[in-house]
């Protein structure tokens, strides 16, 4: 048996995807993970020219295809596409103006929103809940309507350098350097919130040791090669014609 490290050939784990296809698959995989609050939620994906790809308003995350993805500028003007930008897009616009973030994900996932409502960062009880790394904070400065730029500015400022924010009485905001990392972090924070709730309901447990939390916390979300790809392939099996829609 060879002891050499396996290195997948290009395309072995996932076909080459366009940026628009990446946005669609991120939305669909996360919808299946509980990021499914009806029309809520927005994803922005910064492109090399500084514009942002974004999911369209009026279509749910499990519904829109590559042809529906819109391109906007950092002021929210639609540059390409037939749909308007989501109502809450100011949060993303202020974030991208303030920080060099590639991907930002906002939604009201089933379990993370509970902890956001309680204004508590949940304990991390297992390794899967820590995958993707990053710092998690509670932000309670997002106190205006979703389309209010001043409320968005306050939230981004309060977030500081954190990678994941539980927006008090609202939902989550996840930042990452790639689609893969955004998927990993989004899945992990929702799993962390679910497992913490169930563990505490069952009588409590012992969180991960500090050394383990520190180790996982240093991850940029890129280390678990294959995780994102496997979940994306599952979506392509469910909708084999998806890539033909580009």
Regions flagged by a language model, labelled:
Residues 2-246:
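Glycine-rich flexible loops
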